[in-house]
């Protein structure tokens, strides 16, 4: 997808200029959509999407962007703290950095359940991943939950993963990023939405066939080639058929995740939806 962004494939297919904007979190993506600054959010975490629709935001989920294990989203605990999964309850009473309302927030909650630590007894400091990793290295927090290769790499300079990628997988902790679109843009430009999704899936097919240019992707991500290969190696880009039959279908993996997360992050002001299928559509997925 990043390769096609740099090669202006999207502009050529859509027939209009495309303004690409990077955001630190999926919550910032939502805010930009609601303010009218952007029309489509690619690789928005499922957690910020759920928070948005619980708050009645006029957006829809139109595609699965990427599936990932906890290589790209994880909790890193300070080596100096002496805390590991074996004595994780010692985090209680300590400061931890978490970008609230993101997939890292979901991973934080699920990881604490898996290691038997009470997250309600920790002082949670809301920090974007870049700041959280610096806080961990500086000794300001005992643990930082993060996403993004650069932030995790920085945190690992002075910390270790609370759970390995395999341990997180065994605990049922996994991530899904999605593509969401504002209701207004979807209604006014359905053809553009369809083209955007189609070009994305063409890029995914090329990646799955081993034909992506990782040098271009590494440059765009501001990472070295080895780190890029390592991070992308933990990503999965399902095709449209798989998404329709296993993820966005009734009882599918994505729909179950929406229900679980919707209730996990529900508040009295923004309760969980009774039916999340109302904010999901498969109409733009390739045949």
Question: Positions of the model-derived regions?
Answer:
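Conserved C-terminal helix/tail region of periplasmic/extracytoplasmic solute-binding proteins
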Residues: 258-287
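Secondary-structure end/capping motifs
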Residues: 187-268
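Short, solvent-exposed loop/beta-turn-alpha elements that line the ligand-binding surface or hinge
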Residues: 4-16, 93, 167-171, 240-255
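Short, glycine-/small- and polar/acidic-enriched structural segments
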Residues: 1-117, 123-126, 142, 146-149, ...
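Structured segments of extracytoplasmic/periplasmic soluble domains
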Residues: 13, 32, 36, 51, ...
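Stable alpha-helical elements in mature extracytoplasmic
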Residues: 6, 25, 29, 48, ...
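Short, surface-exposed acidic
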Residues: 19, 119-122, 223-234, 270-279
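Pocket-lining segment of extracytoplasmic ligand-binding domains
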Residues: 125, 130-220
């Amino acid at each position: 997808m990043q390769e096609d962004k740099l090669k202006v494939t999207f502009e050529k297919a859509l027939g209009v200029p495309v303004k690409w904007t990077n955001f630190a979190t999926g919550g910032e993506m939502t805010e930009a959509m609601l303010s009218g600054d952007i029309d489509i959010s690619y690789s928005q975490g499922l957690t910020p999407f759920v928070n948005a629709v619980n708050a009645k935001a006029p957006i829809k989920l139109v595609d699965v962007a990427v599936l990932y294990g906890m290589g790209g989203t994880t909790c890193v605990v300070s080596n100096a703290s002496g805390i590991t999964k074996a004595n994780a309850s010692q985090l209680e009473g300590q400061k931890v950095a978490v970008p609230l309302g993101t997939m890292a927030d979901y991973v934080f909650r699920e990881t604490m359940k898996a290691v038997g630590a009470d997250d309600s007894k920790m002082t949670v400091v809301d920090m974007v991943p870049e700041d959280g990793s610096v806080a961990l290295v500086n000794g300001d927090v005992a643990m930082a939950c993060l996403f993004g290769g650069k932030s995790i790499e920085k945190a690992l300079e002075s910390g270790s993963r609370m759970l390995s990628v395999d341990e997180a997988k065994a605990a049922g902790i996994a991530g899904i990023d999605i593509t969401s679109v504002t209701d207004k843009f979807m209604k006014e430009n359905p053809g553009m939405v369809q083209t955007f999704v189609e070009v994305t899936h063409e890029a995914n097919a090329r990646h799955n066939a081993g034909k992506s240019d990782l040098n271009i992707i590494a440059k765009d991500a501001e990472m070295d080639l080895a780190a890029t290969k390592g991070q992308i190696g933990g990503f999965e880009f399902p095709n449209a058929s798989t998404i329709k039959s296993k993820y966005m279908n009734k009882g599918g993996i994505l729909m179950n995740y929406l229900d679980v997360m919707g209730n996990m992050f529900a508040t009295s002001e923004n309760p969980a939806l009774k039916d999340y299928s109302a904010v999901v559509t498969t109409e733009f997925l390739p045949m």
